[in-house]
Amino acid sequence: MIADKSINLDTLYKVLFEDEKLELSEECIRKVEESFDFLQSFSSDKIIYGINTGFGPMAQYRIEDQSLIELQYNIIRSHSTGAGKPLPELYVKAAMIARLYTFLQGKSGVHMELVSLLSEFINRGICPFIPEHGSVGASGDLVQLAHIALTLIGEGEVFYQGKLRDAATVLRENGLNPFSMRIREGLSVTNGTSVMTGIGIVNLIYARKLLRWSVAASVMMNEIAASYDDFMAQALNEAKHHRGQREIAAMMREWVSGSQCVLQRENELYNQVHKEKIFEHKVQPYYSLRCVPQILGPIYDELENAEEVLINEINSACDNPIIDPETQNIYHGGNFHGDYISFEMDKLKIAVTKLTMLCERQINYLFHDRINGILPPFVNLGVLGLNYGLQASQFTATSTTAECQTLSNPMYVHSIPNNNDNQDIVSMGTNSALLAKTVIENSYQVMAIQFMGMAQAVDYLKIQKKLSPKSRQVYDEIRSFFPVFTNDTPKYKEIEAMIAYLKKENK
């Protein structure tokens, strides 16, 4: 796959999840080389931040010529101070792709050898060890990116072929040489929003899958409940002028097509004589079943906006200073500041938390026999009192949803001045992205329990053949690894298997 100046979400998915390789285009190589050549000629006899000055609040100190290369190594080694568990390899790969595309803008003044080595890391599955904690998100992800830079110079550790190993050894085995500093590569690798952006990209991909599954689950819930189908109607949903609501309703109509489970109101209530004073079947189902387009619609809109922000960021020069050969100038500013990503990740985690809350309420409907009126408690297909069905799994779903609600407090407004008040207002963008990551992982856990419960409900009601073709396909796939059960057995492995299924499949 040719790496041009910009990348879209589809290409990112292929590189991240299908192991497509990136090949640098001739135009990108030309731009990188032009930027380096310009910096090399322009920087002579000038004071330029991070080339012949210290970093951050130390920028007031001039660095002597004989120490310029040492300076670039010093920022990498001094900032490799992360803590906590390692960021998973998928997210690290996304961060490296984000850094690569910053360099491909041709505004960083880095040597082409650095760009080539970074692309080799991506293509060969060499993933630097990056601790999760360390970034305040303004000067970007200095600490986490320093851990990437550390491995590019042959120091630190990398995950390679499933093992954590010395970077120098892995480079040697792959016939790769550690990068040697030229002008400002130490600063350029460490300075920017690439880690929070990489995490955000993976978050978005997984959140999109969650939304599709929530649509599927909501249709299946209404099939189980034998709901009236007019809440999905085009006329009803187009009466409200929000794209997301209309899209969700259309997705639901497509999914439910062919179902014999849902009812048509005109057939059941408009064209028949009803003399009963109290209707046995609910005229309008609970909000968690009926208001799905209105609940998931804003989430759809947020994911669309998140894509725009993330793709804009990954295709930007988030370095400082900006090296601009076109205007023959170098500009000092703050393109490393992560507020766009921080704000968007806060919104994303709020959206996914609301999706999780909908999922939890649908589980409650499914498990609560006095609410649904058609299923045994906790869809228990065994002996009531002796067996417990999925009773205890609701504890997991409820507690995990509660954690999502707590984690939805925003990081965007939690700025703490630091760095001798040089960084007196910061984004906390990586923290926001990491919290969104946790919320998304939690949501998959809750949704896994819902799909387990729905499969049990379908078996109890014996409606397999009445389901829509799409619902029947999902039911059959789930039953291939999660068979119907009546006796009490541990279910934690089944929950993990369901999560893996939900993350893998695209419906």
Placement of each model-derived feature along the sequence:
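Well-ordered mid-protein domain cores that form the structural environment of catalytic cofactors
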Residues: 104-127, 134-145, 150, 162-183
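Hydrophobic alpha-helical context, especially transmembrane and signal-peptide helices
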Residues: 43-47, 125-131, 145, 166, ...
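C-terminal auxiliary extensions adjacent to catalytic cores
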Residues: 2-31, 35-38, 68, 151-507
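Glycine-rich, flexible loop motifs
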Residues: 1-45, 70-131, 222, 235-238
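Acidic, glycine-rich active-site loops and adjacent beta-strand->loop/helix elements
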Residues: 55, 82, 101-102, 122, ...
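FAD-binding core of FAD-dependent oxidoreductases
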Residues: 49-63, 67-71, 78-101, 131-153, ...
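Exposed boundary/loop context
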Residues: 43, 47-49, 127-133, 155, ...
